[in-house]
Curated annotation (Swiss-Prot):
Keywords: Ribonucleoprotein, Ribosomal protein. The keyword Ribonucleoprotein applies. It comes from the Bacteria. PANTHER family: 54S RIBOSOMAL PROTEIN BL35M, LARGE RIBOSOMAL SUBUNIT PROTEIN BL35M. The keyword Ribosomal protein applies. It holds the Pfam family Ribosomal_L35p. The gene is rpmI. Transmembrane segments: none annotated. Belongs to the bacterial ribosomal protein bL35 family. InterPro entries: Ribosomal_bL35, Ribosomal_bL35-like, Ribosomal_bL35_CS, Ribosomal_bL35_sf. Gene3D superfamilies: 4.10.410.60. This is Large ribosomal subunit protein bL35. One of its GO terms (biological process) is translation.
Length: 65
């Protein structure tokens, strides 16, 4: 049986936590930041968690995480 390939883009975007979840970065903080309020940008700064509905897709992309 050949090894399962990891999706490299997913490996760079998600980090597994001790509890089995995955950390992720929030979207909308790369460019066009002048029109976004400081509060909005501040709330986008900390890491988020992958939602329960998307967890299966992330696990399939990262077989060895």
């Amino acid at each position: 049986m050949p090894k399962i390939k990891t999706v490299r883009g997913a490996a760079k975007r998600f980090k597994k936590t001790a509890g089995g979840g995955f950390k992720r970065k929030h979207a909308n903080l790369r460019h066009i930041l002048t029109k976004k309020s400081t509060k909005r940008k501040r709330h986008l700064r900390p890491k988020g968690m992958v939602s329960k509905g998307d967890l299966g897709l992330v696990v399939a992309c990262l077989p060895y995480a």
